[in-house]
Amino acid sequence: MRSTSTFTRTPAFLLHTLARWLLVWGVLGSSVVAEKKCASNYYVRSLPGQPDGPLLKMHAGHVEVDHKNNGNLFFWHFQNRHIANRQRTVIWLNGGPGCSSMDGALMEIGPYRLKDDHTLIYNEGSWDEFANILFVDQPVGTGFSYVNTNSYIHELDEMASHFVTFLEKWFELFPEYEHDDLYFAGESYAGQYIPYIAKAILDRNKNTTTQAQSRLWNLKGLLIGNGWISPVEQYQAYLTYAYKENLIQSGTDAAKRVERAHSECISELDSGGKDRIHAGACEKVLSAVLEVTRENGKCINMYDIRLRDEFPSCGMNWPPDLKHITPYLRRDDVISALHVNDDKRTGWRECTGAVSSNFNARNSKPSVQLLPEILESGIPITLFSGAKDFICNHIGTEQFIHNMQWSGGAGFELSPGVWAPRHDWTFEGEAAGYYQEARNLTYVLFYNASHMVPFDFGRRSRDMLDRFLGVDITSIGGNPADSRIDGEKGALTSVGNHPNSTTAEQREKEKLKAATWAAYYKSGEVALVVVAIAAAVWGFFIWRSRRQRQGSGYRGIYPNLNGLSSGSFSGFRNKRSSHDDIEAAADFDASELDTLRGTDDRSRGANGHGSVGGDSEDEDEKFGAQKESYHPSNMPSSSSS
């Protein structure tokens, strides 16, 4: 029997040992990856029902914000379609409290709307043309977000703390967006969320150490539509609005009933209720109006007074798209595509009663008290209202703006006794509303719009957004909308129709192509050097093997060299072509574009649905998809935006 020398056995032994260690590290590495996700784990590779054409680049999934109580927030992020002069990210929040931002994603500003339970169509006027859009279900327990039972949060500062934690972790996953201009937008009870989050971000930036200055967040503005912001003025506006819109007639029994409820509301406000977000007696004013407008089993729609709905829903079955969203978001293939964690044990609901009933905000002051400080810090704010919304009506918004004091003046006062004028706004030849602005605050009234302005007027809302962001397509390209303020066009904005390219985008593609060829050229030089070295080494082995053809040299040490090499590189290619690396390549493109984009920071021109229902899951199901409203009690047994 032929013996094998130690010299010939050792390399084989080393190879086997190395293989074992690689196997062990592979197992350990996979377990680490399973615990700590990266951006590719969130990449949405397909979306059931998507329209024909290339899929928009998007990511979705959960981020943990409360380890102790298993609190996770769900997000859905869409990358901007086109390149503007700088990168911008808009974070959208719906209200409630406890109502999902998937309302905003699929009924308002997102790139898609549902034609039926399984078919998506493009949303003309979506907000993702020149800005990245990030939709977040929050607080914990809302929509696709989740938390352990009995661990729901109660106050606005808790909510803001969770959101800052979310952003810290989200930017770790997607660092290419951390230095974007950051905007927050939302509606209804988000009028409480957004100012609290903005203040938390400003406080975070102030407390950031010198060493971490590169991680300051560029908060650039807030947009709040039909927001629940200042309860004192907004509660009292119910009666005024009801008379103005002829929902009730003076002197009638119906009017007297509403006036009695209004008087009780004033008494509660005068008895310490002015610093609270909720006042039970005042919520009865809204309920009274809904009840007295009841006729033949129907009442006015509190979100759009031009419509009527079954009593006691009174608008909670609206908008019509809602009937498609719940079945779509409960489909297994959609849940899988959006990376919804298995820990989310219940199906998606528009509004979650348990979140609403727990989020009482008893110790939180109304967000209107935060606005002056935010405005004075240099953060512009746009408040916009749909004229046909009752629940957060424009009269209440206009009244609290008039009473609010900031930057040395009250309301839209330009100087003592001189008020900023209202500027008429027309869009494509139609009267669209008006603008009014002073000292960093802009107010926009949308004529003939409901509580959900972007649902009614997507392109007009996008025009408002582009003005606020300072997007001017003069140097970008595209077909501008005919949007005029007091007859003047001003900055050109491009809305709707999702153009395939813009002039600026073509320029950036040419730059990227040149950069790509430069990279290929460099990599070619490196490859030549590597090939030369490899050839020299290979030649050395051939020469050596010929000299030692009769011995037990290196050929005996690596008897399966060719097979090992082939197998190794084949496996490497397979891994490189995996989904994760495809996503990595996609992210490379985005980051390259970021470096090629202009950095012009020149300033541009000025630019609740609440859950009304019980705590139980059964009650949520009983009343169907609830809607945002800031009324967690004393309302018809259902809920709303």
UniProtKB/Swiss-Prot annotation:
Its EC number is 3.4.16.6. The chain crosses the membrane at residues 523-543. It is found in: Golgi apparatus, trans-Golgi network membrane. Residues 487-506, 593-641 are annotated as: Disordered. It is a single-pass type I membrane protein. One of its GO terms (biological process) is proteolysis. One of its GO terms (cellular component) is membrane. It is an enzyme of class 3 (hydrolase). Residues 544-641 are cytoplasmic. Residues 35-522 are lumenal. Gene3D superfamilies: alpha/beta hydrolase (3.40.50.1820). GO terms for molecular function: serine-type carboxypeptidase activity. Protease with a carboxypeptidase B-like function involved in the C-terminal processing of the lysine and arginine residues from protein precursors. Promotes cell fusion and is involved in the programmed cell death. PANTHER family: PHEROMONE-PROCESSING CARBOXYPEPTIDASE KEX1, SERINE PROTEASE FAMILY S10 SERINE CARBOXYPEPTIDASE. This is Pheromone-processing carboxypeptidase KEX1. It comes from Coccidioides posadasii (strain RMSCC 757 / Silveira).
